[in-house]
């Protein structure tokens, strides 16, 4: 029988599950970003899988005292289950590099590059990855009219899970002069591409498969659609011609490798409805591990169940010297 020991620390409870003979893992989740809840839901499944695999697990709700907590518990590995600011943007990997603690998911520079939409876009274009037309708008520009012909997409520079994303259609009663920049003083304004939403899971450098998202209720793949059952259908494998399916796998591996990622990632694409032209949207280096998340679903299609997926992620844990 496993026994939990509960220790009170600032901002969180750490629960320690003892298990002999396996490495000791700190499961980092929660945190202070807008994606806190998604991170916590992801951590539930990850925790169960780690325990099933026989690891000793400590759950840490990340706060400002994270360095002290890591020094106290001295884990062999940190499983980075954070989403958004501090976990996904390269901050935590940078800290763990300094502390020389192996961690899962991509390193500091890869994470920072993928998380910032301006920098990742430049990287994609440099590597001949096709993207929709876009511009950067600063709050200080005081733009009063539409910055681009409608329809267009407003994207915060450094948010995931479609938080803060808005699609402005021709018929919408929207005045850009009233936009309040809720997630920072810069946004990306991107041409809206009407087409098929395609997602590719990559694990340790290998693309596992392509999934298509069919929207059932909302106008685009927003936060509500991503995390609410019944708002979208997932078609896996995506019903595509073999040559296009293969192209998506190759493009995703190319993006992953040129950005020097490790562990899991998810590449997002749009296949334009009229021209069948493929557009890359982004690479997510911290894909969700919730019951509705895409990477576990594609992995299952590829013959990797959730527990084995977590084991494969653990195998890549390392720090950068």
From Swiss-Prot:
Q: Gene Ontology terms, cellular component aspect? A: cytoplasm
The protein's UniProt keywords, in alphabetical order, are: ATP-binding, Cell shape, Cell wall biogenesis/degradation, Cytoplasm, Ligase, Magnesium, Manganese, Metal-binding, Nucleotide-binding, Peptidoglycan synthesis
Which reactions fall under this protein's catalytic activity? 2 D-alanine + ATP = D-alanyl-D-alanine + ADP + phosphate + H(+)
> What does the Swiss-Prot or TrEMBL cofactor note state?
Binds 2 magnesium or manganese ions per subunit.
The record's section on PROSITE patterns has:
ATP_GRASP (PS50975), DALA_DALA_LIGASE_1 (PS00843), DALA_DALA_LIGASE_2 (PS00844)
Q: Which pathway is this protein engaged in?
A: Cell wall biogenesis; peptidoglycan biosynthesis
Cystines in this chain: none
| Alphabetized SUPFAM superfamilies for the sequence | Glutathione synthetase ATP-binding domain-like, PreATP-grasp domain
| Cofactor(s) for this UniProt protein | Mg(2+); Mn(2+)
> Where can this protein be found?
Cytoplasm
Binding positions for ATP per the UniProt entry: 147-199
- What Pfam families does the record point to? Dala_Dala_lig_C (PF07478), Dala_Dala_lig_N (PF01820)
Annotated Mg(2+) 2 binding lies at: 282, 284
All residue ranges annotated as the ATP-grasp domain in the record:
121-315
**Where is it mainly found?**
cytoplasm
Q: Which InterPro entries match?
A: ATP-grasp, ATP_grasp_subdomain_1, D-Ala_lig_Van_CS, D_ala_D_ala, Dala_Dala_lig_C, Dala_Dala_lig_N, PreATP-grasp_dom_sf
Please name the GO terms that the record assigns under molecular function: ATP binding; D-alanine-D-alanine ligase activity; metal ion binding
One BP term from GO: regulation of cell shape
* Record family assignment: Belongs to the D-alanine--D-alanine ligase family.
Q: Tell me the function of this protein.
A: Cell wall formation.
**Protein name according to UniProt:** D-alanine--D-alanine ligase
Q: What is the originating organism of this protein?
A: Rickettsia massiliae (strain Mtu5)
